[in-house]
Amino acid sequence: MPPQIPNENDDLFTRWLKSRAIIQRAVSTRECFDSEVFLASGGWNITNEIITLKKYYQLKWPNSSCNSFHPKTVEFIKERLHNLEEHDSSWKIPNPAYSFKKAFLEDTKSAFSNLEPVWGPSRLLNPAELLLPQDEKLLVQEIPLEFAPFQYTNRFAYGGLQFKNNLFVTYGSYSFLAAGQCVEVHNFDILLNVSSLEICHALLPVIIPDDGDVRNFRNSSYVKFKDTQFNSIPELCSINFMKICNFMHQDFLLACGDNGIVYIWEINKVIKIFNKFTSDILGGKDNSRERYINVDPYMVLRVEESCWSVDVIDINGIIYIAVGHNKPGVTVFAFDKDVKKERRYIRPLDLPSSHNVPCVNFVPNSKDSVGYITLSYCSIFGNVVTVKLKEHDCTILTSFLDTQFFGDDLWTITPLTKKDFAKVDNFELLNLNYQDGFKESMLYSICRDDFLLGYYCDNAYLSGNFGIGTLLNQFQVPVTDLRLTSSAGIPDEVIPLRFTSFDRNYTTTGSIKYEYSREDFALILHAGDLDDMNDAVTKNTSCEQHLHQWTFWEDSGYKHYRATERGFSKYKDIINTFPQLITPSGRNKTSQYQNTSGRKICEPSTYKLTDLENDIEDISREFNRSIRNLKMDKQRQLRTSKEFKSLSSVNHIPNIESGNFLWYNTDAAADWRTLFGKDLNTVLKDPEICSLQLNSTEEDDVNSDPENEESGSSLTSFQRRYRDTEQRAHLKSESQKSWGFHNYVRNVKRLLESAVPGSEDSPLGYQLSEMHDEFFFLTTAHRLVLMKANPLIIISATHHEIFPLDGVVTCASKSLLQALNRINFVCHIKELNCIAVASQLGLISLLRLTEYRGIYSFRQEYILGWEVQDPVNPSPECRCNRNLFDAPMYGADGESSDTYCGVCDVYFPMGDICGLDYTYASDSEELKRKGYATLYVASRGSLRAFKITTEHGTTQQ
């Protein structure tokens, strides 16, 4: 009997599932990162009982026989792509720039691996210098600065090397740098024209109000307004983060302290006092060497624990301030915008987190039809959270949106809109992947999804974009393989070309021939002899042309599902026969944009994955035995664990103390269940999600192995360790990746359900009912991710580490370098559609946000701060990394030693970055100047500046 295939009666999600290598089955486990179960259990991924999910989604990676489209499908897709090209060529062919760009793309592909960054004969690191035409790439030039403005800042004077978030911001010609318990204020204009450093900057001390027993209220939050008298008492408080926000029609400087206090200054007031200070000194009116200026804060906020992030939004007459801290969680304060009215005391809100919150951001222009705004934050636990907020009757109401898990520390989240992306005319310019196999695979898969789900317009002259398939296919963004610069040789035998190919037959990898050692190959690579290098490579077989599905969660540690031979055979038949369904206009309703040919979907029979649904696996066996046998007393959790405490004591009416302080008792932590609105029992009763196996700890299939049994004391010890957030961080990656994929599939269903009815075949493209234009750009410790904002769906990501250190040879501590090498600095240069990402180690990558026919992605253009050295034949410019990250070493004469160690094959000149920000100079016809940005990088007591522009100036939105 021939296999059955999807038909018109299937809902869109079922069609999509059947077209993918994804299975739906039941699993039994104690560790669960299903988003709903996780929230309903109070933010614990370990449950008391074994939970059985009836619909657990897992990737079934097909073999080569599954990676092909039906010839009929290929015919339809080729016709669609041809029509789009014809649509473009009608106006692009007469354009000389278009012809030049087309020739450039063809020449680049014909060069094969010669233009691969690092690998090619030029050995250049930057993809933009090799793979982009002049009018498409950013132009970067370092501006030499003849001064070291941050001489006062000695990082070792404040406890040595410190791990902080961004400590440097710019405001016009002014800059602010956190220096211990002070904020260093500078004027760039004066710095460029005055030689004396002593009169170029001032220090703004961090102060706290000396009002009653402020320091004794450790379990309290407070707010103090500017109408209260402040006493300027310097307080030793290490600043963790600084930011500039606009609200109440003016700009403010915000600083987060290690003591849980957020200071908010009016920038204009700070600048006014600073200018008077510098004017008096420059004019000779003040000969004192006192560099302190005292500016009373406009507002002071306090949370219980150390705070590391803050953001503000001003909307609906209410100011919302969100503070991310190490309680862990997010505290949201709210105030009336109109200070002339009698101030209402709006109760603050605590939002939960399973680990520290290094970044929090409101989504601009996210107000919905009922007045809710959207807040986003990420956690070291490995997840991102979005939640809606609205002030009502002196209370902040919440509506939970989504959470997603990544299996890696998350450090930043940046809201974006479609206007932040630069349009490109060619697919290759989307993320600089010139491999024809990748292009064909992704475009075919997108077209297949559009046809299958009915999200396309038949008339190519009305719609130049692809449909919703652009959100259902994850783009792998290539980054330069910096490991190839290592003097010790490449880290393995496989040579994965990331941007180019060895030939035009879709080959993407090669391997070193057996007669060459890694060291021999390194000599060939660094000698620049291209012929010898290619002769040393064995080209691997071609990759498949279609359906090369890649996901963010796929790596060597991910265990794909292995179906039975019977199940796999049936699954393979579905993949091979399914494309017969794909003919244009796959909708039951009549479309006004339907192709005149009148082709419609055929009438296939129904198929159900019953065999795969009945294949149940207890994945709890994959986890640590102590985790599997963990027995928790839920009542004891409620009494002792922060994550399970009630919000009732948080939301009481505040007590108004002397000095106009607003005190809030925040002894109780926020609870995921309160935010989500459901408890675990409610979720377990949902037959679509899961069921509960009672007395599960006594089931034979769990405890049948006597070696799995643990003593009561061991369980108690494990439970105690597990409750510590640091221990939870080590446990999170065990299964977060597979559960992240499961949640991704569930969010695809939400995405399809959120489409506005009737927009599928509109010439204007599909429309989502909520947050249609919004995205998030996230950084993990080593990777970059672009997500749709709602639901949280990854659409582009880097698969490899952007700053890999595994091949680096250095005399400095490798473990220290790894700890510093987290991507926790992000600077969004909107005017140039550019994002700069950096690690404290001193490495920066300039990225470009791009869009092609409704596909939103990004590309890597430049790498800054990675200087390759040759320890065998060192040049006079070679430097050692030890003085950047360790205490300075001194020679016999007492001078700082800068002697090259003869070991470091990479030097990090911007080591120990403490912050980055930019200024922008607009186009000026009068000055005959194109718009440009200046990226400032503060590191190790020095300042570097990079001029960034494009050949045509500001990108037109």
From Swiss-Prot:
Q: Please share what else the UniProt entry notes about this protein.
A: Present with 125 molecules/cell in log phase SD medium.
Record-linked InterPro entries: Crt10
Q: How does it assemble?
A: Component of a cullin-RING ligase (CRL) composed of 4 subunits: the RING protein HRT1, the cullin RTT101, a linker protein MMS1, and the substrate receptor CRT10. Interacts with MMS1.
Where is the sequence biased in composition, kind Acidic residues? 697-710
UniProt-recorded name of the protein: Protein CRT10
Keywords, sorted A to Z: Phosphoprotein, Transcription, Transcription regulation
Keyword Transcription in annotation: yes
Q: What is a biological process (GO) this protein takes part in? A: nonfunctional rRNA decay
Protein purpose: Substrate targeting component of a cullin-RING-based E3 ubiquitin-protein ligase complex RTT101(MMS1-CRT10). RTT101(MMS1-CRT10) may regulate nucleotide synthesis through transcriptional regulation of RNR genes encoding ribonucleotide reductases.
Task: Return the Pfam families for the record.
Answer: CRT10
